[in-house]
């Protein structure tokens, strides 16, 4: 029996190699290299994304190149994960040096890198402790678990009665917990039953927030300082300050989801810094590794963090030496190259120029730093605009039908910014 299985396996591998060779030989006849990339993904991959039709093979700084060799401005930055620019040499060097030494230990043992990283990141952001994870959604899950545990141990909420409040149109991932907090049908339909104890209120509505916090079973309010996936929705001035005041007043933890807005993207190290307030729990991700490796972090003070005991939460990869070394290098780049300051300056330039575009095509321009969006009037199609931008050498993606997010890497200089603005203007005027 095993001999037959082995023979089948060899035959399958030989068949695969033959097919691969035949495929390579017929590349020219089958179509462009990009089309072959699309076809392979479509055949063998899950259909859970709708990517722009461009097949990328290289990135450097603010630019990416497709498999045909065409260069583009990257105005998505992997949803703000590549703040430091593609393949930043300092981050690449940190990755390769650590990868050749020690990549993973799990948390079953100590490593000589994790403590160094923990000290660095807690001092930088002003918290007692950090719990290292890998992805942004893991950070959100971690924050929710911390908040619930704190609610039971410290606030004395009755068992299994803790509630977490979220803002409508939030987005923090695709896990069951994350979609349980969503009011977007494309995120939650067909995936119930949902996580209990999650409630939604309007974003940027102080009265609604205060009313919800009066419930003694509420342990936390989790909110993005600027709603990214919703279309770069910037709250009113003073909103975050009121969030801080109300959460303190009602003994509720404020969880700031800075996975997309944090790490210099909005022109400050953190978006909450605009109002000089500190959340009880801070979630970081994406650019924490400069797009080089999945790294996320949840930071808070001892009163909250020490509610979690050994064995109650963790991750095999969370806090691994490779991720820690990469994250420290990525954070150093933000500071050494003054990328928050550059994002602030370049963002002002971008919004000022975008505001001159014809109002019959672009009805709204909004954002902070280099997290920006335009709203396309309904008689035009945002997807079609993005296709034309691609043809003209700039990559961006629509969100929610009529909104296009503009978020280039923070290393962009003024010459590059003006060149990319010219592409946007040319494209919009052609509509």
Swiss-Prot record:
Pathway: Amino-acid biosynthesis; L-proline biosynthesis; L-glutamate 5-semialdehyde from L-ornithine: step 1/1. It is found in: Mitochondrion matrix. Keywords: Aminotransferase, Mitochondrion, Pyridoxal phosphate, Transferase, Transit peptide. Its cofactor is pyridoxal 5'-phosphate. The modification N6-(pyridoxal phosphate)lysine is found at residue 286. It catalyses: a 2-oxocarboxylate + L-ornithine = L-glutamate 5-semialdehyde + an L-alpha-amino acid. Disulfide bonds: none annotated. InterPro entries: Aminotrans_3, Aminotrans_3_PPA_site, Class-III_PLP-dep_AT, Orn_aminotrans, PyrdxlP-dep_Trfase, PyrdxlP-dep_Trfase_major, PyrdxlP-dep_Trfase_small. Belongs to the class-III pyridoxal-phosphate-dependent aminotransferase family. This is Ornithine aminotransferase, mitochondrial. It comes from Drosophila melanogaster.
